[in-house]
């Protein structure tokens, strides 16, 4: 499906782990790395397309991830002339317009499976630092990646802070509970201490 301007509607997916690293995947048979992405089928809504692509490309399902954010706007990139297919039977696709999703992996990373389809998109993956993809992706996608990661950085920072706050609250609560128990133990021990005559 290609729009009137020659752009193919597409979803892009950034998957992060609990320490803020992102999943970086190597295109099958190439030394080219990128985030999972794929086209939106005719009549398919954007979120459905994202979950379909998530499964097709990295073998994850809705239960394996938590949706943290979806970009509000379409971001576009043009393909270099050498990659533009000029097939007379189909409209010319000059690039992609994408809506991006930020997901957090909640399952174990062993759930990632690059072989769920007969024609895998990727043949390897790894965790990388959050900003690494902006510098490493092919040049014609770099501007889109920069915009996406800027938008997602604020969301992920809030998630990290929220997680740290929750951990701090739990740790403080555990510490208070420990102190209460120790105080009760001391009081009981003092009560059982023989009084002098």
UniProtKB/Swiss-Prot annotation:
Q: What is its EC number?
A: 3.6.1.-
The cross-references to Gene3D superfamilies, in alphabetical order and at most eight, read: Nucleoside Triphosphate Pyrophosphohydrolase
Which GO MF terms does the UniProt record name? mRNA 5'-diphosphatase activity
Taxonomy, superkingdom: Bacteria
HAMAP family recorded for this chain? Nudix_RppH
Annotated CDD domains: NUDIX_Ap4A_hydrolase_plant_like
What does this protein need as cofactor? a divalent metal cation
Gene Ontology BP, a term: mRNA catabolic process
Mention any Pfam family matching this sequence.
Answer: NUDIX
Family (UniProt) = Belongs to the Nudix hydrolase family. RppH subfamily.
Protein's job: Accelerates the degradation of transcripts by removing pyrophosphate from the 5'-end of triphosphorylated RNA, leading to a more labile monophosphorylated state that can stimulate subsequent ribonuclease cleavage.
Q: Per the database record, which ranges form the Nudix hydrolase domain? A: 6-150
Q: Which UniProt keywords apply?
A: Hydrolase
Q: Which organism is it from?
A: Haemophilus ducreyi (strain 35000HP / ATCC 700724)
The terms describing its cellular component in GO are: cytoplasm
Name this protein carries in UniProt: RNA pyrophosphohydrolase
Motif Nudix box: residue span? Answer: 38-59
């Amino acid at each position: 499906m290609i729009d009137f301007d020659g752009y193919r509607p597409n979803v892009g997916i950034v998957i992060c782990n609990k320490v803020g690293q992102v999943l970086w995947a190597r295109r099958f048979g190439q030394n080219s790395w990128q985030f999972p992405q794929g086209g939106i089928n005719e009549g398919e809504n954007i979120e459905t397309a994202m979950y379909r692509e998530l499964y097709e490309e990295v073998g994850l399902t809705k239960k394996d991830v938590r949706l943290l954010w979806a970009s509000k706007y379409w971001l576009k990139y043009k393909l270099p002339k050498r990659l533009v297919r000029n097939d007379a039977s189909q409209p010319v696709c000059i690039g992609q317009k994408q809506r991006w999703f930020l997901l957090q992996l909640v399952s174990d990373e062993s759930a990632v499976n690059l072989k769920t389809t007969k024609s895998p998109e990727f043949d390897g993956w790894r965790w990388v630092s959050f900003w690494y993809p902006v510098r490493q992706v092919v040049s014609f996608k770099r501007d889109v990646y920069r915009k996406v990661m800027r938008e997602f950085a604020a969301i992920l920072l809030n998630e990290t802070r929220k997680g740290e706050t929750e951990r701090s609250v739990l740790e403080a609560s555990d510490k208070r509970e420990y102190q209460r128990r120790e105080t009760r133990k001391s009081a009981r021990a003092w009560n059982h201490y023989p009084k002098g005559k």
